[in-house]
Amino acid sequence: NAGGKIAMQILHAGRYAYSDKAVAPSSLKAPISPFIPSELDEEGIENQISDIARSAHLAKAAGYDGVEIMGSEGYLINQFLVRHTNKREDRWGGSYENRIRFPLEVVKRIRKEVGKDYLIIYRLSLIDLIPDGSSWAEVVYLAKKMESVGVNIINSGIGWHEARIPTIATSVPKRAFSWVTKKLYGEVSIPIIASNRI
């Protein structure tokens, strides 16, 4: 009654999935899972994009005001972005343009599925806290790309789950990572949400 909105988060764990059916951009075991994921082939990648877009369609049909795409914290979409987990040499890996193809295709497909007026939030990893993570220039570039393909709001993702630096424990000071969100101000014209120990 107060005018609030509710969005459903769409998350694919990728190599973090606790299952022998886990899939990822490359067959690399995560340090926080005992399972080695299978590398997605072209058909598998297309199926993942279609499934995520269908999830957005179902969220809209169920009455949600929007969706948040989990593109951070080391989950599947984030795994495509960085060399740490993406060792592919096809059009989904190698150059940064190729590595961002998966998240961009996800957003484009969702926008096509839900229409131009539906809320899309993208949780973008602003700081990975792992070896071979995204550079700041890459983060800014992807944020701008996300805005250009129809994202309405960027939510700040801080650190991968396998990172050795705590980000949400009660020992972490309040607003400890809000400086990273502030650093992105001015780079995009859409709203940015700060997160972690707020």
What are these regions (language model features)?
Residues N1-I198:
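Flavin-dependent oxidoreductase catalytic cores
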